[in-house]
């Protein structure tokens, strides 16, 4: 198994991902939202790039009698006309269960759609990091951890999340790591904890200044969720893998 890391959505080469497994991370906060919404019973999550596409998709599904919720952000703030912002704490079971969630965010949903040519696209966060690592143990294809980044730039929170999952994966699986994958693993293993390390990150402080400390704490919590989610044919659903994940 070979493991690589892409540092932001701007560095994604969609064609180069063919034949590989992409593990998409937007720790703060899109993939944490997706993980939470599906864990809380959402029927599926549909990630789209633009706000206009989100409204069009919602209209289409509603015409078919489907229940739809819109979630996402621009500049970390809720989009006008959407039901939710990009806070995972808003996606409670009593609200999302059995419903379709359409999401559009600045970084995460863009990264997911750019990875659609990969053989498989897995959605990862700190919340389900160990479950993702356990699932990937059964794969032999090259794995590329895709950090969504922040507005095309490197983001240390996504890098730490990738390092965490790589570290967990390498406990039980021999792997050939690229230099950047080795660095992510080393940075995670040398840190005093994910949230402590990312406190100086630009995006962390944007969210902190908006009063979203509870989001930051939640998104930095390991292994709250023991499920794995796959983006396929434009939709994200729980993987039916038959893999027993013990946490």
Swiss-Prot record:
Record field: catalytic activity: (2R)-O-phospho-3-sulfolactate + H2O = (2R)-3-sulfolactate + phosphate
Coiled-coil residue spans: none
E.C. numbers: 3.1.3.71
Gene Ontology MF: a single term: 2-phosphosulfolactate phosphatase activity
Broadest EC class assigned to this enzyme: hydrolase
Entry-linked InterPro entries: ComB-like (IPR005238), ComB-like_sf (IPR036702)
Keyword match Magnesium: yes
A Pfam family matched in the record: 2-ph_phosp
Entry keyword set: Hydrolase, Magnesium
Cofactor(s) needed: Mg(2+)
Highest rank taxon of the organism: Bacteria
Similarity remark: Belongs to the ComB family.
Protein's UniProt name: Probable 2-phosphosulfolactate phosphatase
Organism whose genome encodes this protein: Clostridium perfringens (strain ATCC 13124 / DSM 756 / JCM 1290 / NCIMB 6125 / NCTC 8237 / Type A)
Organism phylogeny: Bacteria, Bacillati, Bacillota, Clostridia, Eubacteriales
Gene name per UniProt: comB
